[in-house]
Swiss-Prot record:
It comes from Shewanella sediminis (strain HAW-EB3). Residues 160-333 form the OBG-type G domain. Mg(2+) binds at residues 173, 193. PANTHER family: DEVELOPMENTALLY REGULATED GTP-BINDING PROTEIN-RELATED (PTHR11702), MITOCHONDRIAL RIBOSOME-ASSOCIATED GTPASE 2 (PTHR11702:SF31). This is GTPase Obg. It is found in: Cytoplasm. Its EC number is 3.6.5.-. Keywords: Cytoplasm, GTP-binding, Hydrolase, Magnesium, Metal-binding, Nucleotide-binding. GO terms for molecular function: GTP binding; GTPase activity; magnesium ion binding. Signal peptide: none annotated. Its cofactor is Mg(2+). Residues 356-375 are annotated as: Disordered. Belongs to the TRAFAC class OBG-HflX-like GTPase superfamily. OBG GTPase family. GO terms for cellular component: cytoplasm.
């Protein structure tokens, strides 16, 4: 299935049902009191994370989604049925953004997590609500309020513990194949990887982490060059980044300049992403002799002024990959647990705008009929006996 990580949709919550103007009609009580019921609340629109989904492709073909409208109230104090909520299932890791305000509404990072994105309209009031000691035959009702309408931008960001960074052909896909069961395409030309790949690494029994491989970055990626820039967002949730450097590039490029270019693109794209823990992984050690290898490693570390962790591996021969995986799982376990944010917060209803300009009179009733109303229906009945 085609991997789609962005989609724009329009969601419309259901309008609230209108109240009813009705009067009780019974035998011997031709002019009974008001019995118009309230309308039903409109259905709301929710997003729900589902681990059985892994792409947003369905939303590219179906962009408009509307919840059910609340039913109108009826006579005999019958309240209208509330509109059914609409639940849209999205992949775990989806972020919802209001396209008009560019406000982030929340992230769905766990299976079954649900987020309210459009609140249904509030119900209208029937004429029973307006009866009083001075108004025995109210003819007024209120309409239901409109449901919320939003244009949403959905962004799928993969959930991974470790993210791979590097130039094209740095060996990222080979590395993920060597440490997990993921099988991304590997070839000797740039941009072999066109979409992100995930793999699960199990260095020890009962301990594992998820690793993400994205298309390679090139200089100018933050300005739109290459493929990797549109996938950098998938690394935002990673807890540590592995910066893979090809120690002997086939095109003769300078690995130091390539590494600097990657760091520069990270800082341009997102300072937050650039501040994440980042380890330097020098790949393809099997292509050089031991003396030349160590000399190049020292030169790269010195020129980059690297202060963090440095590992030397051969992803193709799986040399050093097991040690690196063990270090990663220990580091991830030592990090504090990330706080979970409850996105299913109640939306505060705007009472100031409630029923604004929605009061209306039922045209089926004429105020001139007030004289026919039986006031005794609500008074004490007096029975005279001989």
């Amino acid at each position: 299935m085609k991997f789609v990580d962005e989609a724009v949709i329009r969601v419309e919550a259901g309008d609230g049902g209108s109240g009813c103007v009705s009067f009780r009609r019974e035998k011997y009580v031709p002019d009974g009191g008001p019995d118009g019921g309230d309308g039903g609340d409109g259905g709301s629109v929710y997003l729900q994370a589902d681990e059985s989904f892994n792409t947003l492709i369905d939303f590219q073909f179906e962009r408009f989604h509307r919840a059910e409208r609340g039913k109108n109230g009826r006579g005999r104090d019958c309240t209208g049925h509330g509109g059914e909520d609409l639940v849209l299932k999205v992949p775990v890791g989806t972020r919802a953004i209001d396209e008009e305000t560019e406000e982030s509404l929340g992230d769905l990072t766990a299976h079954g997590q649900r987020m309210l994105v459009a609140k249904g309209g509030f119900h209208g009031l029937g004429n029973t609500r307006f009866k009083s000691s001075t108004n025995r035959a109210p003819r007024q009702k209120t309409l239901g309020t409109p449901g919320e309408v939003r244009s949403l931008k959905l962004e799928l960001m993969l959930l991974a513990d470790v993210g791979l960074l590097g130039m094209p052909n740095a060996g990222k896909s080979t590395f993920i194949r060597s440490v997990s069961r993921a099988k991304p395409k590997v070839a000797d030309y740039p941009f072999t990887t066109l979409v992100p790949n995930l793999g699960v690494v199990n260095p020890r029994h009962g301990q594992s982490f998820v690793i993400a491989d994205i298309p390679g970055l090139i200089e100018g990626a933050a300005d739109g060059a290459g493929l990797g820039v549109r996938f950098l967002k998938h690394l935002e949730r990673c807890r540590v980044l592995l910066h893979l450097v090809d120690i002997d590039p086939i095109d003769g490029s300078d690995p130091i300049e390539s590494a600097r270019a990657i760091v520069g693109e990270l800082e341009k794209h997102s300072p937050k992403l650039a501040s994440k823990p980042r380890w330097l992984v020098i790949n393809k050690k099997d292509l050089l002799l031991e003396e030349e290898l160590q000399e190049r490693i020292d030169h790269i570390v010195k020129e980059l002024e690297w202060k963090g962790e440095v590992f030397t591996i051969s992803a193709y021969n799986r040399e050093g990959t097991e040690e690196l995986s063990l270090k990663l799982v220990d580091f991830i376990d030592s990090l504090p647990e990330e706080e979970e944010v409850d996105v299913e917060a109640e939306v505060e209803f705007k009472w100031d705008n409630y029923h604004k300009d929605s009061d209306s009179l039922n045209e089926d009733f004429d105020d001139s009929d007030d004289d026919d109303f039986d006031d005794d229906d609500y008074d004490v009945e007096v029975i005279y006996q001989r």
